[in-house]
Swiss-Prot record:
Annotated compartments: Cytoplasm
HAMAP family: HisZ
InterPro entries, alphabetized: aa-tRNA-synth_II/BPL/LPL, HisRS-like_core, HisRS/HisZ, HisZ
Protein name according to UniProt: ATP phosphoribosyltransferase regulatory subunit
Any one Gene Ontology cellular component term annotated for this protein: cytoplasm
Gene symbol of the encoding locus: hisZ
Gene3D superfamilies, per database record: Bira Bifunctional Protein, Domain 2
Main function: Required for the first step of histidine biosynthesis. May allow the feedback regulation of ATP phosphoribosyltransferase activity by histidine.
């Protein structure tokens, strides 16, 4: 089968207006992070598989291939682990505030509707144990969404320590933990009720309530505190309360105590961003204080935020925010000996471009086809208008 006209699963072309909008969004996001004091970092698209082979990345669906020396390499499925590699191996001084943007690749299943190639931008705050690092990530995410004029978005908070504490007390096998994780993610009331009956613990009331513990932050957190006396869970709930109180003035903040991230490296506060016009989250992040241990014997506290720029481009388009590209209003046909004058005239004339046709008649035909209202001819004799008309 000849595939030279097809694209791999989960990839797509972007043309003209969409491509320009995606480019501008990436610029805006990077500029916003720069204004907040973040330093840009870039890592290769290709990494050795070992960077992503830890238990933290067990669920990642990788594009794998061998290099010329037979070593297994992958296309990066996220940016966090490569940045962890850089920080751990280059000897840069902590603490750090880093920003990035670039492509990531995940080999999702066919017909799942997910994009295997995504443009991602984000920040990593490394070396700050304070809760102010989480607050900075959330404020930065909210600031970006406001700068991009994303309408009706909301930030949802969770805490990885809640799920970890439940798993620790239940002492589940790996298979049982996977099943339980799925029940939590699906908010399956019936499934969790059956699970609790088969795995009784001191957290029964809390676990049974997890599928319903999402919504307005203050009410849900108060309800959750009334369902458990476990110190670990209560500490996590208090951290969530602190963050809600700190950032709620900036955006609509909700909580979901059943929020479980796809990557296992999160240890503390986790968060996502949603909007009315989006089917899935386009912002995610959280704290992962042990991630760097994969690359070095010491650990460093870290918090990260990632934005799916492709989803944000789609959101802007649905909201009618993306502006039409400025049309060409003047086509400049020129004789070769008059190229310097034509180039100077183009530089001084907004929304103009040079014609590449040999004859003036072809330039005029092109202008009519593409609704360009005016054509001039630049020669050694000067500049002459050869087409001028109104365009609907």
């Amino acid at each position: 089968m000849n595939l030279n006209k097809n694209l791999p699963t989960g990839t797509r072309d972007k043309l003209f207006r969409e491509a320009q909008a995606a480019y501008k969004i990436e610029q805006q996001v990077n500029h916003y992070f720069e204004k907040r004091g973040f330093k840009r970092i870039e890592t290769p698209v290709i990494e050795f598989e070992d960077v992503f082979s830890s238990e933290h990345q067990a669920d990642a669906k990788l594009y794998r291939f061998f290099d010329e020396k037979g070593r297994l390499t992958v296309l990066r499925p996220d940016m966090t682990l490569p940045i962890g590699r850089v920080v751990s191996t280059t000897g840069v001084m902590l603490p750090l505030k880093l920003s990035y943007s670039g492509k990531i690749f995940r080999a999702n299943e066919d017909f799942g509707g997910e994009q295997n190639e995504q443009t991602q931008a984000g920040i990593e705050i490394i070396g700050y144990p304070s809760i102010k690092a989480e607050i900075e990530c959330i404020l930065s995410g909210i600031g970006v969404l406001n700068a991009l004029e994303i309408p009706n978005f909301q930030i949802e908070l969770g805490h990885a320590a809640i799920y970890r504490r439940v798993i620790q007390l239940l002492n589940l096998s790996e298979t049982a933990e996977i099943d339980f994780r799925q029940l939590i993610q699906n908010k399956s009331l019936t499934g969790i009720k059956r699970f609790v009956a088969n795995n009784p613990s001191t957290l029964d009331d809390f676990i049974l309530a997890i599928p319903r513990l999402f919504g307005p932050a203050t009410a849900i957190l108060n309800q959750a505190k009334s369902l458990t006396t476990d110190k670990g869970i209560l500490t996590a709930l208090r951290e969530m309360e602190t963050i809600v109180e700190a950032v709620s003035y900036t955006a609509d903040i909700s909580v979901d105590l059943g929020l479980v991230q796809d990557f296992h490296y999160y240890t503390g506060i986790i968060f996502r961003g949603y909007a009315d016009l989006a089917a899935d989250n386009f912002l995610s992040g959280g704290r992962y204080d042990h991630l760097l241990e994969q690359f070095t014997s010491s650990s460093s506290p870290a918090v990260g935020l990632a934005l799916n720029l492709d989803s944000l481009t789609t959101l802007q388009n649905r909201a009618g925010i993306i502006k039409k590209q400025t049309p060409t209003t003047l086509l400049i046909h020129y004789d070769l000996e008059a190229l310097p004058q034509a180039e100077k005239f183009m530089q001084e004339t907004p929304n103009s471009e040079l014609s590449f046709f040999e004859t003036a008649s072809n330039a005029i035909s092109f202008a009519k086809k593409w609704h360009i209202p005016e054509v001039v001819h630049v020669s050694s004799q000067g500049i002459q208008t050869i087409l001028q008309r109104e365009v609907d």
